[in-house]
Regions:
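Helicase P-loop NTPase motor core
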Residues: 313-424
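Long, charge-rich alpha-helical interaction segments
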Residues: 422-451
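Conserved helicase NTPase motor core
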Residues: 4, 8-46, 206-300, 314
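Conserved P-loop NTPase-based nucleic-acid remodeling module centered on helicase motor cores
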Residues: 68-69, 81-180
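Conserved RecA-like helicase ATPase core segment
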Residues: 272-344
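A short beta-strand-to-loop transition that corresponds to the Sensor-1 phosphate-sensing loop
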Residues: 55, 74-77, 104-105, 288-292, ...
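P-loop NTPase Walker
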Residues: 1-119, 249
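Conserved helicase NTPase catalytic core signature
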Residues: 176-228
Length: 451
């Protein structure tokens, strides 16, 4: 049986997109689907709006049979705010019990991490904040002397260039020590340490070994203060669900539907934990995402939509002049991507420069001067900002690396010296921009603008 009738689909469309064309066949197929499925969407495809259409329809059916709820998970509070702004009065129904709308982190914190940690720890949770945890860690690390740290030399020595000497070598060793210790994955379930989640072998599991004692005294020091890294929250959540099997039944009885937006940003640990929380035989699980936009290092995205996934290949964000470039520079085969022929997009421009300080001023002048039709890009962006319920700015300059590692490579501060990087647990691709551009069938000389 279909999830929605024609009348319900029309109602959802008129609620969300009254002055825009009807949902196309790809989107209607997704809205009608009432089974667990993956939705594989291209940039600007309207996948979130397609999800919202299902939520509008469900809002009119509340309460659901047996008073079950809807669980909607995404990765940022901005995404939740966007959902609220677009759902309007339906949000009052959907954002209350028995439903749950929020981030994956917030869901795990509320239902798993906080209750479990508080039950097994001598101190209650004070904060789930990687930055705060790093401050406590570094204080504990600073008290360790040379002899304390010799036990991890074998783990980091290959990362120290043999050409380094003196202060440069000492600084590099210190950075690698910190990265090794604080960056390790602590399994609360096994009371063991791993280089990263998913590693086959523990780097420390014997409490009598110096390396375990060092990790326990530094990496776990924040935990003794009730301060968890974001990753720790998932570790304790995993321990709870492994030790309390009936939790899976409880969550699967509570919710009829689980919708996950931006599934491509779900890391391996989050993915595995969600698989343990929800029973696919009892909950309809639909996962929306774009595998070509994942934020993780190559090979780290566990979500892999198969050939049965619902596609949305048509983009409403850009025209064919941009789509044709994205099809060629994408790391994976993205031949199915289609631009909107009704949208006039400016051809891509690649800035080539000698002085990085010239880049942002040139970028600003381009968006202020270049026209699409009779309007500049800036004018178009300002119009879109007014239409957006959250009034977000659509013009952004995005950098590859924020932190200054003193390695001579360009990063955000090279272009904008007053920028201050915020701590992040994400891992970026290590390829260069040139490697992606080189994949284009023809060298893109018509994109290049030398400063």
């Amino acid at each position: 049986m279909d999830f929605a009738t024609n009348d319900e689909i029309k109602y959802a469309h008129d609620t969300l997109l009254k002055d825009y064309p009807d949902f196309d066949d790809e989107k209607q197929a997704i809205i009608r689907s009432n089974k667990s499925a993956d939705i594989k969407a291209c940039p600007g495809s309207g996948k979130t709006t397609t999800l919202l259409a299902k939520l509008v329809i469900l809002a009119n059916r509340m309460p659901l049979p047996a008073n079950k709820g809807i669980c909607v998970l995404t990765h940022t509070n901005v995404a939740i705010d966007e959902i609220k702004s677009k759902l309007s009065h339906q949000a009052n129904v959907l954002f209350n019990y028995p439903n749950y709308f929020g981030t994956i982190q917030g869901f795990v914190d509320k239902y798993l991490t906080i209750p479990y940690f508080n039950s097994v720890s001598d101190v209650p949770i004070a904060s789930i904040d990687s930055e705060r945890a790093s401050i406590i860690f570094e204080n504990a690390f600073s008290k360790k002397g040379f002899e304390d740290l010799t036990c991890i030399w074998g783990q980091i020595k290959d990362r120290i260039p043999k050409t380094l000497t003196g202060k440069d070598k000492r600084n590099k060793v210190r950075r690698e020590q910190i990265e090794f210790l604080f960056g390790s994955y602590y399994s609360a379930d096994k009371n063991s340490f791993y280089r990263e989640y998913g590693a086959n072998r523990a780097i420390a599991s014997d409490v009598g070994k110096p390396i375990f004692q060092l990790l326990d005294a530094t990496r776990c020091q924040p935990l003794r203060s009730g301060v968890l890294k974001f990753e720790d929250a998932f570790s304790y959540g995993m321990a709870y669900i492994n030790r309390c099997a009936n939790l899976r039944d409880a969550f699967s009885e509570r919710f009829s539907y689980l919708f996950i937006d931006e599934m491509q940003d779900t890391n391996e640990l989050q993915y595995d934990l969600l698989e343990k929380i929800f029973d696919k035989d009892k909950v309809i699980i639909q996962r929306f995402g774009d595998p070509f936009q994942n934020i993780f290092e190559h090979g780290k995205m566990k979500w892999n939509p198969d050939s049965k996934a619902f596609p949305i290949n048509f983009s409403n964000r850009f025209g064919e002049s941009i789509a044709s470039v994205l099809r060629t520079v994408c790391e994976k085969n993205n031949a199915s991507l289609k631009g909107n022929v009704a949208i006039e997009s400016h051809k891509p421009i690649l800035l080539v420069f000698d002085n990085p300080l010239n880049v942002l001023p040139k970028f600003a002048s381009l968006v202020s001067e270049l026209k699409i039709g009779d309007k500049t890009i800036l004018e178009i962006a300002n119009e879109e900002k007014e239409k957006d319920g959250l009034h977000r700015n659509r013009i952004k300059a995005v950098g590859w690396v924020g932190k200054d590692k003193k390695d001579g490579l360009l990063r955000l501060t090279s272009y904008y010296p007053s920028y201050e990087a915020k701590p992040s647990n994400g891992v970026l691709y290590k390829h260069s921009l040139f490697e992606y551009i080189r994949k284009s069938p023809s060298y893109p000389t018509n994109w290049i603008l030398r400063l």
